[in-house]
């Protein structure tokens, strides 16, 4: 394959196809049949006098499938019309780009439905967890992992997540384990209910409580007035306390608690 002429425009492309009275545009989705394997790609019949070529790097967004093993002679499927190579006079096709478009469409649907997801873990870095959703790389920040243990033995396993932030234009996909845990326990997380948990962090603005897989915050304003100035002496990490649920933030996966409202 030769490098595409960068000066080639959509108008030039239209002119090439108008010569054959064929109505196609870059970005179109076309049906085609694979009829020949080349060294670095396959030839595809899409019904045009101009030949169509699928480079190996455009076979799939999945690195494990980005080879010829998933393709066969006479396979008929849809392709994304990616480019036109002036020098080789070939239409350049892509399955990878088509998968990308459909993946984001599916993700937008999952976001609208606020779905609880089973997502494959791809690895970890200092900031959190790297996952794969619909072939798109996503990220779970440490602040939304709750108590999930970050270790290599978890790689390729599945974790329950919910979407947190989706920005298709910047290819930014942020998910939350914390939101998923709140959703799974939602039937028991009723405002006014009393829960019991263990203090796992003491800060100037309150107490962080671990109750099972969930984390909650007793803000300093929700601790008994007499105890506010003596938090370090009144509480220590590992203490078991009871608190009342005063707010469940399902969008951020946060649990707000109060000790002032205990009867």
Curated annotation (Swiss-Prot):
Assigned keywords, A-Z: Chloroplast, Plastid, Repeat, Ribonucleoprotein, Ribosomal protein
Gene Ontology CC terms, in alphabetical order: chloroplast; ribonucleoprotein complex; ribosome
Signal peptide feature range: none
GO MF, one annotated term: structural constituent of ribosome
Entry-linked SUPFAM superfamilies: Nucleic acid-binding proteins
Alphabetized InterPro entries for the sequence: NA-bd_OB-fold, Ribos_protein_bS1-like, Ribosomal_protein_S1-like, S1_domain
Primary residence: plastid
Keyword Plastid: yes
Compartments (UniProt record): Plastid, Chloroplast
PANTHER family named in the record: 30S RIBOSOMAL PROTEIN S1, SMALL RIBOSOMAL SUBUNIT PROTEIN BS1C
Family per record: Belongs to the bacterial ribosomal protein bS1 family.
Protein name (database record): Small ribosomal subunit protein bS1c
Species the sequence originates in: Porphyra purpurea (Red seaweed)
Gene: rps1
């Amino acid at each position: 394959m030769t490098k595409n002429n960068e000066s080639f425009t959509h108008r030039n492309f239209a002119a090439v196809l108008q010569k054959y009275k064929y109505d196609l545009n870059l970005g179109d989705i076309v049906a085609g049949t694979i009829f020949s394997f080349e060294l670095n790609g396959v030839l595809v019949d899409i019904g045009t006098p101009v030949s169509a070529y699928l480079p190996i790097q455009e076979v799939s967004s999945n690195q494990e499938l980005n080879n010829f093993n998933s393709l066969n002679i006479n396979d008929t499927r849809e392709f994304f019309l990616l480019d036109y190579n002036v020098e080789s006079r070939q239409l350049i096709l892509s399955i990878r780009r088509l998968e990308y478009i459909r993946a984001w469409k599916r993700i937008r649907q999952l976001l609208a439905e606020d779905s609880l997801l089973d997502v494959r873990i791809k690895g970890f870095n200092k900031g959190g967890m790297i996952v794969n959703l619909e072939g798109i790389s996503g990220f779970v920040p440490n602040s939304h992992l709750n108590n999930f243990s970050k270790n290599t033995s978890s790689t390729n396993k599945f974790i329950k997540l919910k979407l947190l932030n989706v920005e298709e234009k910047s290819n930014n996909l942020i998910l939350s384990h914390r939101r998923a845990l709140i959703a799974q326990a939602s039937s028991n997380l009723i405002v006014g209910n009393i829960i019991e948990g263990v203090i796992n962090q003491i800060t100037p603005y309150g107490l962080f409580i671990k109750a099972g897989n969930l984390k909650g915050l007793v803000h300093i304003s929700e601790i008994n007035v007499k105890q506010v100035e003596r938090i370090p002496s009144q509480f220590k990490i590992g203490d078991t306390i009871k608190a009342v649920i005063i707010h469940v933030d399902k969008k951020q996966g946060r649990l707000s608690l109060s000790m002032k409202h205990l009867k």
